[in-house]
């Protein structure tokens, strides 16, 4: 959730949701970053931010003040974002608020209270209830399970887009954040699914033998 490339992908994600509203079901999941994918220093983090910012032609540079290289993973913001789902907030508002707090404002998102306050304000819910839920074993279990799903895809780059259709087609993008290839793939897969539906309307299910 706090990956810089996930942050840069948000406009694409928002446009895909707008463009395919009513045609595609969208869902986000957490894939925790471990030491193998985390910078070893704040200076290294700044270097990565400069590179991604230049690639995105960004008018601003991401903030590294939040980053603590001694931490092996970032449970607090991810658990709070996941916990907000249990209060009915399955959209992007809490996740985006936490990402902005870290990557734009440099807030200490390793602090459970800071991230809970940020998430609660974004969702308009009680901060103590959100914090209690975020710290519950069930939430950590859920994000570790979704992280295991990510690893099972045998990809390494975030964000990852996994597109499935009812006819069994699947497309996986790892580290791709531009709209055009994702939209082209969705158009192709939706067209194939529509063709299957049209064929079934004319001929029914396949013969059993």
Regions found by a protein language model. Give the residues of each.
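C-terminal cap of thioredoxin/glutaredoxin-like
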Residues: 2, 10-18, 100-209
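Structural alpha/beta surface segment adjacent to cysteine/selenocysteine redox centers
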Residues: 7-104, 197-205
